[in-house]
């Protein structure tokens, strides 16, 4: 918990509606967070949930994607506040803009470069085609 780690709780407002604790900050698209000299940029990527976000560290070419996108598939959209249409929009308007040398780190499973994602993730490629 935040008390144990002595750090602020940051979450999107949409996802906070299911969170039992108190948020210190609601994350918005484009927010910038300074983490000991590393600049983190928030990108809203609804689809898995309406409040899904990815955290981009441009200096290290790293993206923490949570359950939005994985090396070979996308996050589930069959939850109460998930949306396949929003996932498609997130893939087209946000994720597809990340350079090939950026490495994604999902909430679980393997990391991958965006070049690998563009090669092996058929669900992502399908979103770009529809």
Regions found by a protein language model. Name each.
Residues 45:
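Hydrophobic alpha-helical positions that pack around
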